[in-house]
From Swiss-Prot:
Entry protein name: Proline--tRNA ligase
Top-rank taxon, per record: Bacteria
Aminoacyl-tRNA synthetase in keyword set: yes
The reaction(s) this protein catalyses: tRNA(Pro) + L-proline + ATP = L-prolyl-tRNA(Pro) + AMP + diphosphate
InterPro entries per the UniProt record, alphabetical: aa-tRNA-synt_IIb (IPR002314), aa-tRNA-synth_II (IPR006195), aa-tRNA-synth_II/BPL/LPL (IPR045864), Anticodon-bd (IPR004154), Anticodon-bd_dom_sf (IPR036621), Pro-tRNA-ligase_IIa (IPR002316), Pro-tRNA-synth_IIa_bac-type (IPR004500), Pro-tRNA-Synthase_IIa_type1 (IPR023717)
SUPFAM superfamilies: Class II aaRS ABD-related, Class II aaRS and biotin synthetases, YbaK/ProRS associated domain
EC number from the UniProt entry: 6.1.1.15
Subcellular location(s) of the protein: Cytoplasm
Encoding gene, per UniProt annotation: proS
Subunit-structure text: Homodimer.
UniProt xrefs under Gene3D superfamilies: Anticodon-binding domain, Bira Bifunctional Protein, Domain 2, YbaK/aminoacyl-tRNA synthetase-associated domain
EC main group: ligase
Family named by the database record: Belongs to the class-II aminoacyl-tRNA synthetase family. ProS type 1 subfamily.
Function recorded in the entry: Catalyzes the attachment of proline to tRNA(Pro) in a two-step reaction: proline is first activated by ATP to form Pro-AMP and then transferred to the acceptor end of tRNA(Pro). As ProRS can inadvertently accommodate and process non-cognate amino acids such as alanine and cysteine, to avoid such errors it has two additional distinct editing activities against alanine. One activity is designated as 'pretransfer' editing and involves the tRNA(Pro)-independent hydrolysis of activated Ala-AMP.
Length: 572
C-alpha cells in the first residue's frame, strides 16, 4: 500500500470526549470515526487490524473443528418469547416492529436463532456433536456507551454454539474452545488470563472469561499467590473467617449520630474502626418469601457482591435496592440509620459479619446508632451467606495462597449452557435408546472489535500504538527521505516494496511529499512494528536504517541483507 493511494486520516490533537487511551489513539490513528453515540465507522487502518483479528479467530475456530455459518442480525421476537428472554433481557434489547406490525429485535446474541435452526436440521444423536460459529455484527442498546469500541452499541463478535447429547461431550468441546481461545490470544501477543466467571443473563452451569490485563479495564480479576486459581471478582468466593467470634467486651448503647449518615462519617466522627461497623442494605424480597424487603449485612469496609446476593432465594431477581421512600415506609427511618437490632425484616449476614463482636450499626431511628452490638446477646444470629466481594489478602477459595486483584478487559467468554435454551425451545434428537432427548449446549464468544481496543490498551506509548506483528495494519513501513528528488532512494524504496510484498509482507510505502518528521510521527502513531528509513547519505555506505517500534532501537543494515533481516524479525 502507498500512502499516496491510501486514506491515512491521522490527527495530532487528542479528542476531548475520548476517555481511555485506546479510544484516543483509534481516533488519532485514523482507525475509527464516531457516527452517533456508540456507533463507529471503521476506516481503512482500523479495518486492516479488524480483519487480522478476524482471520486469527477464524483459523483457530476451523482448527478446533467448528463450522462457520451466518445468521441474520434481525431476529423474530417470538423466538425470544419462546426462550423466556424477551422479558429477562431488559432495555439493552432493541425491539421494533416491521410494516406488518410483526415484532423483531436486533440481535445482541444468537442462542435463540441457532437453537431454532438446529432443531429443524438435526434429528439423531448420530449427527452430534456439532459446533457452529459466525463472525457477525451485534447490537446492544447500552444506556451509556463509552470508551469508544470498548463499550459500543454496535460491535463485531465471534459467537459459537455447540450441541451434544451428553455432558461428557459438552466438556470435550468446552475444553477444545478453551484451548482455541488461549491460542487465539497468544497469537496476538496479548497478556491475558482465563478466569472463572458468573454465567450472567446467558445462563448455564460453568463459565470462563478471557481477560486482557490492563489498568483501564472495567473488571476486577482475582488471582491466587499460591496456585493457578483466577476468577472474576463477581464469582470469587469469600471464605468464612477461620478465627472464632471474640467474646463481648462492651455494653449495648444507643448513641446520637445526627451528622453521621454514612459509614465514612460514622468512622470519622466517632473514631470507630471501620471493620467494627456494619452496613445494612435493603433490597426487594422474592415474592414467595412473604416479605417486601430483605436486609443484607456486610462489614463497613466491604462491598456487597450483587451477583452473589441476587442468587439468594430470598432476593428478588433482578436485584433491586429499596428506595428511600420504601425504606421509610417499612422502617420509619432513612437509609443512613439502618441496622439489624430490632429490625422487623428477614436478615442475611455476610460470613465476616457473623463473627463480629462489639460492632456499630444504625438503630433504625433517624440520627441514632447502636454501638457495642453482639450476636446472641442483643439479637439472634441471622441466616449467614457469602455476600461480599473478596479483597486483596483474603485466603484463596482453593485454600492455597492469598488473593491479589488486577484490572482486566473481557475479550472472550465461554459457557456450558446445559439445556436452558434447548429445553425451552424443545430442541430434541432421537437418542441411542430411540427416545427423544433434549440437546445439551455450549456457547463461546469473542468480542472481535473489543480485542482491537484491548490490544491498544496493552500496547502503546506517548507516541502512539505499538501493534504486535500479528495484528498490525502494516508489518513494515518504508520511509524514503526525499524520494522525489533522489533517484537511488526511490529505486531502492520501490524495489524493497515489491520484494516484501512478494514475500507476503503487509508493507506501506510512504511516498508523500512530506517532511521526515511528519512521516515518522504518522508511522509511530498507527503503530507499524518495523520501519525502514532510506536516505541518500546512508546509501553511500549501502545501508538503510531499521527501527523497531516496540524497543525503539535503531540499526544500520546492509541494503543487500535488509529483506532477509526483516523476514527474521517479523513474527509470522
Amino acid at each position: 500500500m502507498r500512502t499516496s493511494q491510501y486514506l491515512l486520516s491521522t490527527q495530532k490533537e487528542t479528542p476531548a470526549d475520548a476517555e481511555v487511551i485506546s479510544h484516543q489513539l483509534m481516533l488519532r490513528a485514523g482507525m475509527i470515526r464516531k457516527l452517533a453515540s456508540g456507533l463507529y465507522t471503521w476506516l481503512p487502518t482500523g479495518v486492516r487490524v479488524l480483519k487480522k483479528v478476524e482471520n486469527i479467530v477464524r483459523e483457530e475456530m476451523n482448527n478446533a473443528g467448528a463450522i462457520e455459518v451466518s445468521m441474520p442480525v434481525v431476529q423474530p421476537a417470538d423466538l425470544w418469547q419462546e426462550s423466556g428472554r424477551w422479558e429477562q433481557y431488559g432495555p439493552e434489547l432493541l425491539r421494533f416492529v416491521d410494516r406488518g406490525e410483526r415484532p423483531f429485535v436486533l440481535g445482541p446474541t444468537h442462542e435463540e436463532v441457532i437453537t431454532d435452526l438446529i432443531r429443524g436440521e438435526i434429528n439423531s444423536y448420530k449427527q452430534l456433536p456439532l459446533n457452529f460459529f459466525q463472525i457477525q455484527t451485534k447490537f446492544r442498546d447500552e444506556l451509556r456507551p463509552r470508551f469508544g469500541v470498548m463499550r459500543a452499541r454496535e460491535f463485531l463478535m465471534k459467537d459459537a454454539y455447540s450441541f451434544h447429547t451428553t455432558q461428557e461431550s459438552l466438556q470435550e468441546t468446552y475444553d477444545a474452545m478453551y484451548t482455541a481461545y488461549s491460542k487465539i490470544f497468544s497469537r496476538m501477543d496479548l497478556n491475558f488470563r482465563a478466569v472463572l466467571a458468573d454465567t450472567g443473563s446467558i445462563g448455564g452451569s460453568a463459565s470462563h472469561e478471557f481477560q486482557v490485563l490492563a489498568e483501564s479495564g472495567e473488571d476486577d480479576i482475582v488471582f491466587s499467590t499460591g496456585s493457578d486459581y483466577a476468577a472474576n471478582i463477581e464469582f470469587a468466593e469469600a471464605l468464612a473467617p477461620t478465627e472464632p467470634r471474640a467474646p463481648a467486651t462492651e455494653e449495648l448503647r444507643i448513641v446520637d449520630t445526627p451528622n453521621a449518615k454514612t459509614i465514612a462519617e460514622l468512622v470519622e466522627q466517632f473514631k470507630l474502626p471501620i471493620e467494627k461497623t456494619v452496613k445494612t442494605l435493603l433490597v426487594h424480597a422474592h415474592e414467595e418469601s412473604g416479605h417486601k424487603l430483605v436486609a443484607l449485612l456486610v462489614r463497613g469496609d466491604h462491598d456487597l457482591n450483587e451477583i452473589k446476593a441476587e442468587k439468594l432465594p430470598q432476593v428478588a431477581k433482578p436485584l433491586t435496592f429499596a428506595s428511600e421512600e420504601e425504606i421509610r415506609a417499612a422502617i420509619g427511618a432513612g437509609p443512613g440509620s439502618l441496622g439489624p437490632v430490632n429490625l422487623s425484616l428477614p436478615v442475611i449476614a455476610d460470613r465476616s459479619v457473623a463473627v463480629m463482636s462489639d460492632f456499630g450499626a444504625g438503630a433504625n431511628i433517624d440520627g441514632k446508632h447502636y454501638f457495642g452490638i453482639n450476636w446472641e446477646r442483643d439479637l439472634a444470629l441471622p441466616l449467614v451467606a457469602d455476600l461480599r466481594n473478596v479483597v486483596e489478602g483474603d485466603i484463596s477459595p482453593d485454600g492455597k495462597g492469598t488473593l491479589q486483584i488486577k484490572r482486566g478487559i473481557e475479550v472472550g467468554h465461554i459457557f456450558q449452557l446445559g439445556t436452558k435454551y434447548s429445553e425451552a425451545m424443545k430442541a430434541t434428537v432421537q437418542g441411542e435408546d430411540g427416545r427423544n432427548q433434549v440437546m445439551t449446549m455450549g456457547c463461546y464468544g469473542i468480542g472481535v472489535s473489543r480485542v482491537v481496543a484491548a490490544a491498544i490498551e496493552q500496547n502503546h506509548d506517548d507516541r502512539g500504538i505499538i501493534w504486535p506483528d500479528a495484528i498490525a495494519p502494516f508489518q513494515v513501513a518504508i520511509l524514503p527521505m526525499n524520494m522525489h528528488k533522489s533517484f537511488r532512494v526511490k529505486e531502492l524504496a520501490e524495489e524493497l516494496y515489491t520484494t516484501l510484498r512478494s514475500h507476503g509482507i503487509d508493507v506501506i510505502l510512504d511516498d508523500r511529499k512530506e517532511r521526515p518528521g511528519v512521516m515518522f510521527a504518522d508511522m509511530e502513531l498507527i503503530g507499524v512494528p518495523h520501519n525502514i528509513v532510506i536516505g541518500d547519505r546512508n546509501l553511500d555506505s549501502e545501508e538503510v536504517e531499521y527501527k523497531n517500534r516496540r524497543v525503539g532501537e535503531k540499526q544500520m543494515i546492509k541494503t543487500s541483507e535488509i529483506v532477509e533481516f526483516l523476514l527474521s524479525q517479523i513474527k509470522r
